[in-house]
């Protein structure tokens, strides 16, 4: 529904409808009622300034009152004309909000989000209509005084700005109560303070891309985004999910490190900004906030069911109306008794909308405007714009007017390109400064060496102690310990298109009868002043270096110097880190050749700033920018001065001024009640512990990502900002010198070359933009490298210690209860050992769906791709090398391509050969000294069980090189030198009885070689074996690689290989996992072998937790039956998967697809359905929150809801599984928990069931199902 936005003039008279006089006691500036305009339902605009200070003043204060930049103008909104402009400006912005679907939905949420009539102190059976958190008094001037005549219950009041015009806020109206309804689900009305004509500015310095035409620059925020940001705070307040102020990130402030003395950054702000910065809040805390909100909403639903009274009692006739209003607001359902209840799916959708979808990052993408990349982005001098002028700002385009070409690169927001964006007077701006002073001797301090740095020019680095430490606490595990799983990933399109917000909501009349509210006497707030900070340093740091590069005002004789000290001592000298530039600039114009001189100067500068270096010792980054060191004097005293050498020696941590060494505290231990004596409770405790172990790994990874985003990336981004400043200062000096020389130039061509001179100066900005792209790439690679190389190994090391302790405790628990657990001891120990066999991979995309972070990681991944010297891919049904080196690839006639996956090939008979001849241009050192080989392989059972040795990949000539062999279920990598001395790596991949092996399954093999160290063998990203190879003699590598099975005579002996790559670098463990994640195709559901699961194909189905049993019908109910022969996988009743949406026959099944399962039974097909009758966990029990349903067969193959399932991919190192969900009557359940005979009435078999409390089962292996297809590689 689109709510119309009404037009008003400030001079319009009060009308007892949508123009009223309201008394706002929170505003200490105005003690009389103020004129208010309802521009759309429940949203009022009051064109007045606002202050809650005890002694309010709009004048510029003597000292900063904000740690951010402040701007003061006491005359703003002092006239009716200005108030009219403000009113119409807000109206125009609301009309612009209504231009997009996301904006319409925002307004809709605000309109129907009236705060609850009451709070936690209100009796649970009562609506209280006298609360100041919901009501505003309406007054009229009668008989010489103001009198209250009515009330209104608005959602939002929009005032003009605070004394600091740049301080946009959305505050609450509280009555001195101890609790806060905005935190407790009830909600409160919201008061906004905004100034839409005054615009914050930011730079795109840290963005991934910028135009080579317009270059990087300073941009202003679109006022519609600034307003929507504050309205999102209002949403959180109205819906009672506002986050308390103690949930925040504190800045790290220390004597020896330069970071912002900034305010605490509230979680509320990070949610409202959205995007990448939300990931700073650890997942565990985000889940807790959601659970808290869910609990509050359940309490409110309970209240609604009990309410039968009102305050005042005369309003009792309104009970049903307000019950309807609040049930629509919270999206409650009614159960079969007519009571209001929370629908979990609807709650999740609403909560996701309010906390994820409604955010500044999403708004800016939907309105196609330029916006700051991070919440911590640096702000610059604000600007002013007349947004009422359609020649400047329109409802459709904002500042980026198409008719002026301002839509290109958002140049309408570019303060250098759009003359309508007027810079504010710096005299009215107040900044907080850090005074930096050079300590001349140990005890000597000289103020003449001090410089002043704006607080917002320092990086914001979070205090690590302000990031949740809960994962480091000890935890007691019982049979009742649950894992709460909630994903805050969201689909924007689904959110915009869904119909969750009521289409025709119940609406209250704007003007309501007076309810005689108690007077609200709120005390004013005391103004807090901040003082500048002084810090002493022992050397000229980056702030001194930047200061030395600034151009002084009114200097007539500019010279460049390569001495920082000299530049700091003389106003006419500018420091440059480019000696050749200083020489050319200082030489000046010779023999009247002005244009030649100017061209030489510009060319020297632009050539130097585009330089990049590569160092063989650095494998972490593709290039380095050598002049960053002399531009900013980065690094410690031992390494300062030689940036390249320092970087090669110390790595990326060398760039971090503060806290370069990442540390992780010891993880808390899991403990168990040793007194447990019930068999089922012990088993359940073990299962819960394994689930909690997985959660501990995920929480630890999330904690690491939070630290990286809030403590590391902010420091790296700060280098970007400083380098942009540095290059801009250099360009300013060059421009000023060109202007001075041009002013003195008296040549006859002076006027003719004027435009060329201007073009030269403009070209500096373009080249700075290109240089910044290189710098950004370098800095981003450094940041990601720090995550993967400095942080991840330490986290995994601590997790491995935690695993060792936990596994030991679990085995001890089983051993100490072996009598009670008779018959289950071996199975439980095997399950524990298997669970702890592999570490959980770190896939950063599991912790964020932010597009910017994905771009950064993909860029890092591309640097891995850049090192490929062979990459076999299928193009137009031919196997070719796509590495760029164009190796010759010859495929034998009998080789089958693209048999299972796009880039695979099948080898069977001895005549099947693929011969690859590498490009001769590949350097010897590049292919061997640091090299890696990776590929996916699938080896048939008969080839595995053979006792012969088969060479399957061979690159040995004249007794030297490498090869890959198979023998007795082992895969062996052999590296051999010219003297036939060799080293080998061996991995046993053969099938075990517990189905944990790799026979005939796809698995990922990586071998890395380093001639000065080790060669290593990885399987699915896990290091399995390493061997020193530095004692080998010379290894001559053949440029020919032959794929084939030597001496093969059995037609059932075959193998498949896909995605074969050779890299000219030693891939790290993190690199390998990135390649693995990029090739595993998680969106494609896999069968037991790792092949794509397909529709209209027969499968045998087994449960991962009960691999010794197959699924079969018994009395029309599905049960698990013991295998008569565990080596026979093709046992039982085959299942065919059918598509609900008529997908192409035999097409791949994707993650989340809806499916129907048909089972062949007694030569007839049946549909598997979920029974509609509940099986109770204890016979005769009641179905409450833990309903259990059996699976059964139905002869009718129609498309019925109880037979529709959705499927989700589960991939775990050496097994491919799926989870299956049942959707029926809006009650989503997971097929999980094999219910054992003693647990309910089915006495003779283990039975698969559907359970409603599926959130606690998502990590349980009893919910993992495997589909076994008849495969040529497994012949029975």
Swiss-Prot record:
Segments for region (C-terminus of receptor binding domain (C-RBD), Hcc): 1083-1276
Mutagenesis / variant outcome for changing residue 644 to K: In strain: CB16
Record flagged with keyword Plastid: no
Record motif Host ganglioside-binding motif, residues: 1252-1255
GO biological process, one term: proteolysis
Region annotation (Belt) ranges: 458-547
Region described as Ganglioside-binding loop: 1235-1245
Effect the entry attributes to changing residue 1251 to F: Significantly decreased binding of heavy chain to synaptosomes, whole toxin is significantly less neurotoxic
Outcome (variant: residue 1235 to W): Increased binding of heavy chain to synaptosomes, whole toxin has half neurotoxicity
Binding site for Zn(2+): 229, 233, 269
EC number in record: 3.4.24.69
Industrial and biotechnological uses noted in the record: Cargo proteins fused to the N-terminus of whole toxin are imported into neurons; stabilized cargo proteins are poorer substrates, suggesting partial unfolding of the cargo protein is necessary for import.
Cofactor note: Binds 1 zinc ion per subunit.
Effect the entry attributes to changing residue 1242 to S: Significantly decreased binding of heavy chain to synaptosomes, whole toxin is dramatically less neurotoxic
Mutagenesis / variant outcome for changing residue 1238 to F/Y: Decreased binding of heavy chain to synaptosomes, whole toxin is significantly less neurotoxic
Cofactor dependence: Zn(2+)
Similarity annotation: Belongs to the peptidase M27 family.
Subunit (UniProt): Heterodimer; disulfide-linked heterodimer of a light chain (LC) and a heavy chain (HC). The LC has the proteolytic/pharmacological activity. The N- and C-termini of the HC mediate channel formation and eukaryotic host cell binding, respectively. Can also be purified in complex with a non-toxic component that is larger than the HC. Dichain toxin from strain CB-16 phage d-16 phi copurifies with NTHNA, and in complexes that include NTNHA, HA-55, HA-33, HA-22 and HA-17.
Name of the protein described by the UniProt record: Botulinum neurotoxin type D
Gene from which the chain derives: botD
